[in-house]
Amino acid sequence: MAAKKKTQKRGRTVLKPKGKAGAAAIESLRGQIDRVDRDLHDLLNERARLARQVGISKGQQGRLVDFYRPERESQVLRLALERNAAARGKGALRDEEIVRLFREIMSACLAQEEPLKIGFLGPEGTFSQSAVYKHFGHSARALSLASIDEVFHEVEAGHADFGVVPIENSTEGSVNHTLDRFLTSPLQICGEVELRIRQNLMGRMKSLREIKRVCSHPQSLAQCRQWLKEHLPDVELIAESSNAEAARRARDEKGTAAIAGETAAEVYDLSILSADIEDRPDNTTRFLVIGRRT
């Protein structure tokens, strides 16, 4: 039998196969993964087919929003979490990863005919857009709008199926304009999204040494003050109107980095140079999902 090397990993001994036997074991595991992937692919396609049949059986001819049922989505997620709890100790994924995967699966199935249109307070790359994707998945069509008023108006007029608006920040308090808008709007609250505000340093450079200036919204700069002082004490700090505008500058200007959420890195094709640089990890923003009916 091939020799095995002992290594320590987080307090426990792990045996690592060496030589040809080790390479064969890795190939065998990869083959098993490939078979699981094929099964997953077939099951995902079967789920999509069944989801489409549900729509047809309901007489789906009109608006897709009528076939998005938040209560059914909650039931699917609850069952997924129950199964995950039962699988503890057997290599189970974390609950938040399970929720994210199932939301993306449901989003893709729902979008087979036409994606849901979700209005949010823009511009693109903001935390509001991150909240859209967290709740509806990346298959939803996120519509960047200029103001909270416009989000309400687009949903009221039927140009967007749902809207996502900020309602409360754990450090800044309530968003009064959102609260005021409910006084005159017929829209209803259809759901809630709690988003941990993770600030990331991003840019096109390969190392922090290449950074000449850092742009971000004043709140984000303030939330990362200590990290910036420790790691980039000599760079210029520039306040921008939004984190998205800062990310755009980081994309277009050599030597410029931005502080923003992960979605901004995706939208503006930036590399995350350092993740989770906020001084307080407990900062969250709560968003409401608004629609014409529950």
What are these model-predicted stretches?
Residues A2-T294:
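Domain-level signature for soluble enzymes in the chorismate/prephenate branch of the shikimate pathway
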